[in-house]
Amino acid sequence: MSQVESAASIKKPRKFTMTDVQQLLLQARAYIALVVVIAVFSFLSEAFLTPANIIIVASQVAINAILGIGMTFVILTAGIDLSVGSVAGLIAMIAGGLINEGLVLPMFGVIVYFHVWAVILISLACGALVGAVNGFIITRFNVTPFIATLGMLYVARGLALLRSDGNTYPNLVGKPEFGNEGFPALGSGTFLPSSWVGDWVHNLSGSAPKLVTDVMTFLALPYSVWIMIAFTIVAAVVLTKTPFGRQVYAIGGNERAAKLSGIRVDRIKVIVYMISGLCAGMVGLLIASKLVAAHPATGVFFELNAIAVVVLGGTSLMGGRGNIGGTIIGAFIIGALSAGMVMVGVSSFWQQVIKGSVIVLAVIVDQIQAQMQKRVALQQQQRMELAAQE
């Protein structure tokens, strides 16, 4: 081959086109939206970006974020889980009953009271079990995820009501003689007591830079935020660094191809619904702990919030595309938007309209991105065919 032919055969670097810019902006839309929301409300309210308000927002975001993490796994497989809100309510009632009433064993004539950590583990296991039932129904009987989880929504809510005949389990503080104290700390406790941090900040305020006092304030982050961070890290690692995560994406991208490649699709689906149930159980525990009470109506409409944060984060409802980081950003968009509107005095009725509009806009943008990616893929295929003909 001559030098001229060799030079001609070398591919020229592709130019950065306007389409590339549009795709980049679409992929980063969640991050851009969060920055815009923060910038707008920081301008409208000086108190919006204070450490104290950020901690409050983060603790509120933790609920939607943890639910969203479980929902992300499900939606990545092109599924949906409408039962997560009811499962959260059911698990809250299970935990409340175990703390206040214990486990009654009529055949032995005894009542067993569990340590608070055992209550937490049993409750989480029950959440995962409900998820496993969802996954089994979907895979074994070929029921669509929408119908299967819609049915479980009613079943779980009914079981939550039956657990206490529709009554609330109040005052979930436990008793020293039963060794089940400490449950309220799960939802509102901190690694360092806020009173200590407050004293340190007060003592340092006159001598230390503002940055130091702000960092000290963040030491009072509640356990719920740290739990959210832990769930986020574990979920992100599982999805991006393990064969299981790659199989989840493969199923959502093309389930038939995934089956032909040897992936045990049914097994993976059951596991992702178990993860969703586990996350819902964690949310139920956090809410019951924070309120120091368990109510059977806990978690109503939470499934809609979970779907919203996943969609806002850029995960495709068609499956196969999305990530945990985007879901967390989506949760913070909803949290920052809600907190900001309250701080500037937006009517609660208008808040619902605005949040709903944002979600619809996010879905529209997601569809635009999907269409653009298809168009780009088609153009690339055409260029390859032309190059092959030459």
Question: What is the meaning of each model-derived region?
Answer:
Residues 19-22, 75-80, 129-183, 195-196, ...:
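Short loop segments and helix-boundary regions at transmembrane helix junctions
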Residues 30-43, 71, 123-127, 156-159, ...:
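Hydrophobic core segments of alpha-helical transmembrane domains in multi-pass membrane transport
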Residues 39-103, 129, 136-146, 257, ...:
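Single transmembrane alpha-helix segments in multi-pass membrane proteins
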Residues 115-123, 127-134, 138, 215-294:
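Helix-loop-helix "hairpin" substructures at the membrane interface of multi-pass membrane proteins
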